[in-house]
Amino acid sequence: MGRTLLLLSRPGCGLCREMHTVVERLRGEFSLELVERSIADDPALLERYAHEIPVLLLGETELARHRVAESDLRARLRALGVSEV
């Protein structure tokens, strides 16, 4: 089992689908689990991130917001010492 990424999203969010796709591609390179959580289900998250999604977190560390290039996320994961497969 790898490190867990949390993707904050909401239904119908095109940018969220794009970020999910990028993360899924990188799961083949890194030891990662992905949990996706809709801000629509949590009033506190909705208030905090209403216009900021998608947001990708590793623990308390924000890895990306709105858009992320696969190469940039790969570099961030390596810099944070996430194990490669």
Where are these regions (language model features)?
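Local sequence-structure signature of Cys/Sec-based thiol-disulfide redox active-site neighborhoods
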Residues: 1-25
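Proteins that catalyze or organize thiol-disulfide redox chemistry
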Residues: 1-3, 82-85
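Short glycine-biased active-site loop of nucleotidyltransferases that positions the nucleotide triphosphate
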Residues: 46-48
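Non-catalytic, surface beta->alpha helical segment in thiol-disulfide oxidoreductase systems
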Residues: 59-84
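Short helix-capping segments at alpha-helix termini
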Residues: 27-31
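Thiol-based oxidoreductase modules, predominantly thioredoxin-like and allied folds used
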Residues: 32-43
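Structural micro-motif
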Residues: 50-56
